Structure formats: C-alpha cells, structure tokens
Design a protein with these regions (language model features):
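Short, acidic, metal-binding catalytic loop of nucleotide-sugar glycosyltransferases
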Residues: 81-94, 101, 115
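Boundary detector for helix-to-coil junctions that initiate low-complexity/charged tails
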Residues: 1-46
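Conserved catalytic core of nucleotide-sugar-dependent glycosyltransferases
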Residues: 157-234
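N-proximal low-complexity "stem/linker" segments adjacent to membrane-targeting elements
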Residues: 31-87
Length: 244
C-alpha cells in the first residue's frame, strides 16, 4: 500500500520531531529539540486503610503474582503503593516486594511496611540488580506463573489487575501493558520512541515494536520472555538502568 505525502506532511513531521506536548496517563510529556521532560500531575489521593486480606485464598492456576521493588530513599513511602495493590477488585495470589540485601544490611524496615505482611505482602531479599529487581527474581522463582510488575511510587486504580488479567485472558500469548513506547522512524529514517497510552482496549494490535512502560503496570504471561533476560551480567552491563 502506498500513500502520497505532500510537503506539508513532511514539514509537520519534522516539527513534531523537534517539539511536541502530550498528556499521558497523569504525566505531562514535553519533547523539545530531542530532549524529553516527563512530569507527573500533582493531586490528592484518599488512601483508604486496609481492612481485609489483599491476596486471594482461592486456588488459581497459573498464579497471578504482583512484583515490585524499592530502595532506601523510598522505603518510608512504598507502603502507600503496596496498599493500593492490596485493595484490588481482583485479588492476586501474591504481592512480593524485593529488597536488595546490600541496601538494607541489617534488614531494618519501617513498621508502616512490615505491618502490611498481615494483609498478604511478602518481603523477599535478593542481590542488587537495581530496578530489574521488580521482575527478574520473581521470574526465576515462579517461571510458570503470571507476573505483573509495578513501580513503587504510583497509586494504582483498584481495577488495575482486573483489567490486565481480563486482557490477558483474551490474548494469553501477549504481554499486556497500560502504557507503551512504540518504535517508529522519524523523517530521517532513524528509529525513535513515541509515547502512547493504552486503555485496556483489545483493538490495539500486538506488535514487537511496542515497549511496555513499567509505571502503568505490565503483565507477563508464563514463558513470554526469552530465558536470556535472566542473564544479569549482560543486562547490567548493557542496560543497567532501563528495566523496561
């Protein structure tokens, strides 16, 4: 299929590569001469206290596991994110928080965090592989289960897991993501990443050009990733800070 493109479209594409502004899932994203600035909206959230177990006691196969990590600078705040993950309309089988032993040598944690264990939180320890801790240790320990990764500084909607899981049931062969970057070519033919928001709509076609964005929540079906992703030496050498 061939589509004619006039000079106006060429100029429009060129301008878009230099400057653009988007409002994506509670973030302002501004692109200016190749530089990207991303700023979260500020708003008040009414965080309700937990009153019941936040994980299911019913048998589910494969298991649905929520996995995240944090570091010392956020250890006193991460309980807020976890609280929202324990208040889901679809309860997971596990909610795991991975912490690096090197960062917490005495394993001293705030009560605001450890108190969540009575509501279903599991705290596990691993080596320091930075933000990859949210996925890799869980993938190693539970290779046959569904894994949903989240960030540690976001309040999640109570239907996050329900929507991701329902989307997974429709396409169990695909990784599900609320947000993704889509690889495209600019007017010079170079590859670049374009922010795109997902709204749990099955009409969005799967593509290997989509890169999931972790803060929105990402669901990985069992065996959806190549075993090479477990090679910590390789990813820490080539992409030490880009777990997405």
């Amino acid at each position: 299929m061939i589509k004619k493109v006039g000079i106006f479209q060429d100029l429009k594409s060129a301008f878009a590569c230099l400057f653009s502004w988007q409002d994506i899932d509670e973030h302002y994203v501004i692109k200016l001469f190749g530089a990207k600035i991303c700023k979260k909206h500020k708003y008040n959230v009414d965080l309700k206290p937990l009153t019941e177990l936040g994980v299911t006691q019913e048998k589910r196969s494969p298991h649905l596991i929520v996995s995240l990590t944090t570091f010392p600078a956020r250890i006193n705040l991460v309980h807020k994110t976890i609280t929202t993950l324990l208040q889901q309309t679809l309860k997971p089988d596990m909610v795991i928080l991975w912490l690096a032993e090197e960062q917490f040598p005495n394993r001293e944690l705030p009560a605001s965090l450890t108190d969540l264990q009575q509501f279903g939180l599991s705290i596990k320890w691993c080596e320091d592989i930075k933000s990859y801790k949210k996925l890799i240790p869980t993938l190693r320990e539970f290779p046959d289960d569904i894994i949903v990764t989240t960030d540690d500084d976001t309040y999640y909607d109570s239907r996050l897991l329900e929507r991701l899981y329902n989307s997974y049931l429709e396409r169990p062969d695909c990784i599900q993501a609320r947000q993704a970057f889509m690889v495209k070519r600019d007017f010079n033919g170079e590859f670049f990443m374009k922010a795109r928001s997902y709204v749990y709509n099955s009409s969005y076609l799967p593509s290997y050009k989509n890169e999931p964005v972790g803060c929105g929540g990402v669901l990985y079906p069992p065996h959806s990733l190549d075993l090479n992703v477990l090679n910590a030496k390789q990813f820490m050498q080539e992409l030490p800070t880009h777990d997405d």
